[in-house]
Each structure stands twice: as structure tokens, then as C-alpha cells.
């Protein structure tokens, strides 16, 4: 069952650069290739202004904003106990350079990438949110993709790292139907957007080849950042627990989680 989110979906006709345009996408994906009938979904946001665009998960943004607001008031707040993507993508207008931001363990990676997608255009079209959307295909991240872009929405941008078509990408899906983004709403915002910076993590700046190595190392040992973080303690029932035993339990959980997360959007990272 799809989740409902407290976002007002409004279609705006005026696409001048007077304001930041906010495009809301539904992202549906299959996390485990051995269970193709099990899907998960997230609401993704793409903010576009004259100079740049920023893409992120709505739930993560809401959580980070709430935690930042609490910290300014001296309150310690924990993020909700739910699965949320940490992926963010910042693109610069008229450039192939992007900044991909993601978190692995307790480390946040700021990855510099050069994205130059090769698109093939077709005469077919469909309608998405009353916009005529034309067909295009490309290959990216080890997958073949079919996209639909609207020339009447004059932004050469799209969800995640997708870009470079003569109109906004309003729908895109990979050949295996494991990952699909579809535009669900458009609205104007009257403020300069800035993603909340919590500063509660280690930060590493690197290029994409070095990130590939870091990502592969993380999947081999997803609990590496947890080493030394658990002290001996007494639980709520009064039972003594060694820190090393707690760590091993967490290590097992992280390894099981990684095994089930085997159908990532950039599948080439694990092949």
C-alpha cells in the first residue's frame, strides 16, 4: 500500500524563474530482486531555480528540519525509526557537474560526478499531469531507462541524476521495472531553499571512482562504523550485557539488511 504524505500537490502554469519551482515525484522501487512483488515507495522533491536544482527525500528533509529546529532549542531529538533514503543530488544549471550526497553508516559522502547521459528520442508520447510527454531512452548505472519529458516544462532536469532532455523528465522507469519515478505535483515556493545541515556526521569529499571503492567496502562491512560504540550495560530488565555482544547483534542486523538491499538504482556499483 502506498504511503500518504502531507504535501499539497498543485499544478502551476507559470514557469518563469521568479520563484523556486518544486516538483514532487513518487518513487517506487523493488529493494530485493528475489522478491519482485514487494515494492517500497518514497516521495521525492526536486527544487529548481535559475542557478541550480536540489533533489532529496521528503521524509528525510522533514526529519532533518525537525531535528535541526530542536537542536537550536537545546533539545536532543532522534530521527524516526523508519527507512528513509539519505540520497541528495545537487545540479548546476548548464553543467554536467553534479554533487551526489549520501550517508553510509555514520559517514556522509559528498561525491563530485560528471553526468553526460546519451539520450535517444522517439516520436511516441503519453500524458502526465495533463502535460504531453515525449519518449526518450538512455543507459545509466548499469540499467536501461525509458523516460518521458514535457517540453512545456522548460527545465533540462529530472529526478535523481537524470537530466539533459529538452524538457522536464516527468516519468522514468528502468527496463526491469524495478525503479520508477513519476511526477505527481508542481508548486511555487516563495523562499530561497536551503537544506538543513545537522553537522552530526563525519564528512568526506571525494570523486566518483573513490566513492565506488568506499561503497563496496561499506557493503562488505556495513557495521564498521559501529566498532567501539557499544559499552557494557544493563538493560531495562536488569540484565547485564557486554558491549561486544550488542555489537555482534547490530552487525548481524546490518549484514542482513545489506543482503536484502541487492537491487539498488545504480546496480553497477555492486556488480
What spans do the regions from the language model cover?
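Extracellular or lumenal secretory-pathway regions
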Residues: 19-118, 122-125, 132, 146, ...
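Bacterial Sec-dependent N-terminal signal peptides
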Residues: 1-23
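Sterically constrained small-residue positions within well-ordered secondary structures
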Residues: 9, 14-16, 37, 127-129, ...
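Short, hydrophobic/aromatic-rich segments at coil-to-beta transitions
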Residues: 20-22, 129-136, 164-171
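Short secondary-structure boundary segments
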Residues: 9-11, 123-140, 145-148, 152-154
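Intrinsically disordered, low-complexity boundary segments flanking structured domains
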Residues: 9-12, 32-34, 42, 108, ...
Amino acid at each position: 500500500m502506498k504511503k500518504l504524505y502531507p504535501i499539497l500537490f498543485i499544478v502551476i502554469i507559470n514557469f518563469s524563474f521568479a520563484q523556486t519551482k518544486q516538483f514532487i515525484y513518487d518513487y517506487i522501487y523493488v529493494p530485493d530482486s528475489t522478491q519482485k512483488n514487494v515494492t517500497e515507495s518514497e516521495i521525492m522533491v526536486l527544487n529548481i531555480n535559475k542557478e541550480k536544482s536540489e533533489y532529496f527525500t521528503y521524509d528525510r528533509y522533514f526529519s532533518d528540519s525537525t531535528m535541526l529546529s530542536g537542536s537550536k532549542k537545546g533539545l536532543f531529538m532522534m530521527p524516526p525509526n523508519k527507512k528513509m533514503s539519505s540520497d541528495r543530488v545537487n545540479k548546476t544549471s548548464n553543467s554536467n557537474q553534479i554533487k551526489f550526497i549520501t550517508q553510509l553508516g555514520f559517514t556522509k559522502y559528498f561525491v563530485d560526478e560528471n553526468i553526460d547521459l546519451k539520450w535517444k528520442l522517439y516520436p511516441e508520447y503519453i500524458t502526465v499531469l495533463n502535460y504531453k510527454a515525449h519518449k526518450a531512452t538512455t543507459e545509466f548505472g548499469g540499467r536501461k531507462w525509458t523516460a518521458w519529458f514535457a517540453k512545456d516544462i522548460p527545465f533540462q532536469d529530472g529526478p535523481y541524476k537524470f537530466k539533459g532532455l529538452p524538457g522536464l523528465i516527468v516519468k522514468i522507469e528502468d527496463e526491469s521495472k524495478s525503479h520508477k519515478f513519476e511526477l505527481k505535483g508542481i508548486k511555487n515556493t516563495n523562499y530561497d531553499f536551503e537544506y538543513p545541515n545537522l553537522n552530526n556526521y563525519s564528512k568526506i569529499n571525494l570523486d566518483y571512482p573513490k566513492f565506488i571503492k568506499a561503497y563496496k567496502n561499506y557493503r562488505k562491512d556495513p557495521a564498521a562504523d559501529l566498532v567501539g560504540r557499544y559499552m557494557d550495560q544493563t538493560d531495562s530488565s536488569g540484565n547485564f550485557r557486554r558491549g561486544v555482544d550488542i555489537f555482534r547483534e547490530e552487525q548481524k542486523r546490518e549484514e542482513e539488511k545489506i543482503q536484502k538491499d541487492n537491487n539498488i538504482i545504480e546496480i553497477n556499483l555492486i556488480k
